């Protein structure tokens, strides 16, 4: 960075003397602007950067994070990048016609000036914009999220990436016809959009449109699902959610939300305990999650569900670590539909069981630990399958896809952590054939991969450290001895074989692979030894139906 000096003087040579009048006009205006600074503004630093930019003929001007309430009217005419983000700006001056990139996020802008004709990137998220000016044809990327925009102007043909999340848009813009080669990704999540224009089908199938958490009518959802399910469909991939985006942001005190799950004779004691956790991180959203959980299909229809939740809450009250993990898992669950809450409940039960395993609950019950590990493995495979399924769908709510595989296969795969009912299976796009294929794939991969996976599972390592300390120490010594004696040569051999010797990125990747292979070999040997001993003693078995 150049030395800071607010008292720039013009060099006394013929070149600068020729244009000194121009410089003087800039400097005089900037010095006057600096003297009008409000308390807390760093206008002296801003003027220093302005003068440096002008004298050095720099194409970038960065005035971000200076707490500025305004900018001078005459910005350097040659700049192609202007960054004024994280200030207190309520408006912008006339922008240089040369400007290609404008960053003015996290200000208080209510409107924008005329945009330069060559502008390629507009980043004005987190402001107070209610509308936008005409967008230049050159625009490639635009982020206008977290504003108050009700409608959009015509979108340039060149626009590749648009983020308009959390505004007040009531409709999508028209999408132009023709075989435009541009691959687009547009985000309109969490607006007020109730219908989808037919022009959305003009976009190519490589394009993606995100419209989650909007009040889409059931008619619009059904029509889109029908269109996108057609074998002849060649339009964009559309990501939606069954949420209408209108969840109540009010929440009641955490203790009240918790005690509602307990019988009346316990509520006073429970309230007193949970009152102490009111100010923990994510406590408010956890309270809202509990209230939404009570309105799920499982809560209404599953016998013993309330008792199950109450028992879980008791465990949370006794463990700060588990409570912190659970609050974090539930943090976003209230921002989507009922099935998102159900999927989060699945994840919370997984968190509890893995925590209990790590803390020693299964130290003396290897069979139960294997069963838990097997369930976690099956869930991981189902997540992989769901992820692949999402890629094949053109109209998709990812939450419904992930939950569908868990819910519909809960009984066949003995998934104790999965809810047995979901509300919107019909829009998941998961077919009966998908479920049969998924079950077969899980069982096949379990047969071939589970023991390797289990040998690297964190809770199993925690059990080994506590109950097989000597064997664990020997395994660690063997691992580090192998790394010390063989690691470098194995990495070098791998790089040479691939013709990437001397490539730093390839070396890091090869090193990670060698490390994984070493750990797999050592921990698999240890696991086989311990399981052979323990399972023969209690009659359990490694392979399970």
Swiss-Prot record:
<keyword id="KW-0832">Ubl conjugation</keyword>
<dbReference type="InterPro" id="IPR032675">
    <property type="entry name" value="LRR_dom_sf"/>
</dbReference>
<dbReference type="GO" id="GO:0005576">
    <property type="term" value="C:extracellular region"/>
</dbReference>
<feature type="region of interest" description="Interaction with target proteins">
    <location>
        <begin position="1"/>
        <end position="242"/>
    </location>
</feature>
<dbReference type="GO" id="GO:0044164">
    <property type="term" value="C:host cell cytosol"/>
</dbReference>
<dbReference type="InterPro" id="IPR029487">
    <property type="entry name" value="NEL_dom"/>
</dbReference>
<feature type="region of interest" description="Linker">
    <location>
        <begin position="243"/>
        <end position="250"/>
    </location>
</feature>
<keyword id="KW-0614">Plasmid</keyword>
<comment type="function">
    <text>Effector E3 ubiquitin ligase that interferes with host's ubiquitination pathway and modulates the acute inflammatory responses, thus facilitating bacterial colonization within the host cell. Interacts with IKBKG (NEMO) and TNIP1 (ABIN-1), a ubiquitin-binding adapter protein, which results in TNIP1-dependent 'Lys-27'-linked polyubiquitination of IKBKG. Consequently, polyubiquitinated IKBKG undergoes proteasome-dependent degradation, which perturbs NF-kappa-B activation during bacterial infection. Mediates polyubiquitination of host U2AF1, leading to its proteasomal degradation.</text>
</comment>
<keyword id="KW-0833">Ubl conjugation pathway</keyword>
<feature type="repeat" description="LRR 5">
    <location>
        <begin position="140"/>
        <end position="157"/>
    </location>
</feature>
<dbReference type="GO" id="GO:0042025">
    <property type="term" value="C:host cell nucleus"/>
</dbReference>
<keyword id="KW-0433">Leucine-rich repeat</keyword>
<keyword id="KW-0677">Repeat</keyword>
<protein>
    <recommendedName>
        <fullName>E3 ubiquitin-protein ligase ipaH9.8</fullName>
        <ecNumber>2.3.2.27</ecNumber>
    </recommendedName>
</protein>
<dbReference type="GO" id="GO:0070936">
    <property type="term" value="P:protein K48-linked ubiquitination"/>
</dbReference>
<comment type="similarity">
    <text>Belongs to the LRR-containing bacterial E3 ligase family.</text>
</comment>
<dbReference type="GO" id="GO:0044314">
    <property type="term" value="P:protein K27-linked ubiquitination"/>
</dbReference>
<feature type="repeat" description="LRR 6">
    <location>
        <begin position="158"/>
        <end position="179"/>
    </location>
</feature>
<keyword id="KW-0964">Secreted</keyword>
<feature type="repeat" description="LRR 1">
    <location>
        <begin position="57"/>
        <end position="77"/>
    </location>
</feature>
<feature type="repeat" description="LRR 8">
    <location>
        <begin position="205"/>
        <end position="228"/>
    </location>
</feature>
<feature type="repeat" description="LRR 4">
    <location>
        <begin position="118"/>
        <end position="139"/>
    </location>
</feature>
<dbReference type="GO" id="GO:0061630">
    <property type="term" value="F:ubiquitin protein ligase activity"/>
</dbReference>
<keyword id="KW-0843">Virulence</keyword>
<feature type="repeat" description="LRR 7">
    <location>
        <begin position="182"/>
        <end position="203"/>
    </location>
</feature>
<dbReference type="Pfam" id="PF12468">
    <property type="entry name" value="LRR_TTSS"/>
</dbReference>
<keyword id="KW-1048">Host nucleus</keyword>
<keyword id="KW-0808">Transferase</keyword>
<dbReference type="Pfam" id="PF14496">
    <property type="entry name" value="NEL"/>
</dbReference>
<feature type="repeat" description="LRR 2">
    <location>
        <begin position="78"/>
        <end position="99"/>
    </location>
</feature>
<comment type="subunit">
    <text>Also interacts with human and mouse U2AF1 (U2AF35).</text>
</comment>
<feature type="repeat" description="LRR 3">
    <location>
        <begin position="100"/>
        <end position="117"/>
    </location>
</feature>
<feature type="region of interest" description="E3 ubiquitin-protein ligase catalytic domain">
    <location>
        <begin position="251"/>
        <end position="545"/>
    </location>
</feature>
<dbReference type="GO" id="GO:0052170">
    <property type="term" value="P:symbiont-mediated suppression of host innate immune response"/>
</dbReference>
<dbReference type="InterPro" id="IPR032674">
    <property type="entry name" value="LRR_E3_ligase_N"/>
</dbReference>
<feature type="domain" description="NEL">
    <location>
        <begin position="253"/>
        <end position="545"/>
    </location>
</feature>
<feature type="active site" description="Glycyl thioester intermediate">
    <location>
        <position position="337"/>
    </location>
</feature>
<dbReference type="GO" id="GO:0004842">
    <property type="term" value="F:ubiquitin-protein transferase activity"/>
</dbReference>
<dbReference type="InterPro" id="IPR051071">
    <property type="entry name" value="LRR-bact_E3_ubiq_ligases"/>
</dbReference>
<keyword id="KW-1035">Host cytoplasm</keyword>
């Amino acid at each position: 960075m150049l030395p800071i000096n607010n008292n720039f003087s013009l060099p006394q040579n013929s070149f600068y003397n020729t244009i000194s009048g121009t410089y003087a006009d800039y400097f005089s205006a900037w010095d006057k602007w600096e003297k009008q600074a409000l308390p807390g503004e760093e206008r002296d630093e801003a003027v220093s950067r302005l003068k440096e930019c002008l004298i050095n003929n720099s194409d970038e001007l960065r005035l971000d994070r200076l707490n500025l309430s305004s900018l001078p009217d005459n910005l350097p005419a040659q700049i192609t990048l202007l960054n004024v983000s994280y200030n207190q700006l309520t408006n912008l001056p006339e922008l240089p016609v040369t400007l290609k990139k404008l960053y003015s996020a996290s200000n208080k802008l209510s409107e924008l000036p005329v945009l330069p004709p060559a502008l390629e990137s507009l980043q004005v998220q987190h402001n107070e914009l209610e509308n936008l000016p005409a967008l230049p044809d050159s625009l490639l990327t635009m982020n206008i999220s977290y504003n108050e925009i009700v409608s959009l102007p015509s979108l340039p043909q060149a626009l590749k990436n648009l983020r308009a999340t959390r505004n007040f848009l009531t409709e999508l813009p028209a999408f132009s016809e023709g075989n435009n080669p541009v691959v687009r990704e547009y985000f309109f999540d969490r607006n007020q959009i109730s219908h989808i224009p037919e022009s959305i089908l003009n976009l190519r199938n490589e394009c993606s449109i995100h419209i989650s958490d909007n009040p889409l009518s059931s008619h619009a959802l059904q029509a889109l699902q029908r269109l996108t399910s057609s074998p002849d469909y060649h339009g964009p991939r559309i990501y939606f959610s069954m949420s209408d985006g209108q969840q109540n942001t009010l929440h009641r005190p955490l203790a009240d939300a918790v005690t509602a799950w307990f019988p009346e004779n316990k509520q006073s004691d429970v309230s007193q305990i949970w009152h102490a956790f009111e100010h923990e991180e994510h406590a408010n959203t956890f309270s809202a999650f509990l209230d939404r959980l009570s309105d799920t299909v499982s809560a209404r229809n599953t016998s013993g569900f309330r008792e199950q939740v109450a028992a879980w809450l008791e465990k949370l009250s006794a463990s700060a670590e588990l409570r912190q993990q659970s609050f974090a898992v539930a943090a976003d669950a209230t921002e989507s539909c009922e099935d998102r809450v159900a999927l989060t409940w699945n994840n919370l039960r997984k968190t509890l069981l893995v925590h209990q395993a790590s803390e020693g609950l299964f130290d003396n019950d290897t069979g139960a630990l294997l069963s838990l590990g097997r369930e976690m493995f099956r869930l991981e495979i189902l997540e992989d399958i769901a992820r692949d399924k999402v890629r094949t769908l053109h109209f998709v709510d990812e939450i419904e896809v992930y939950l569908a595989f868990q819910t519909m296969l809960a009984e066949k795969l003995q998934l104790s952590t999965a809810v047995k009912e979901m509300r919107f299976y019909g829009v998941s796009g998961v077919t009966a054939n998908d479920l049969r294929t998924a079950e077969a794939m899980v069982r096949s991969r379990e047969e071939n991969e589970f023991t390797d996976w289990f040998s690297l599972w964190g809770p199993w390592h925690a059990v080994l450290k506590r109950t097989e300390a000597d064997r664990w120490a020997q395994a660690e010594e063997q691992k580090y001895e192998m790394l010390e004696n063989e690691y470098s040569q194995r990495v070098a051999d791998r790089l040479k074989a691939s013709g990437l010797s001397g490539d730093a990125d390839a070396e890091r990747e090869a090193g990670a692979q060698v490390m994984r292979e070493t750990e797999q070999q050592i921990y698999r040997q240890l696991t086989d030894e311990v399981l052979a001993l323990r399972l023969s003693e209690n009659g359990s078995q490694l392979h399970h139906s």
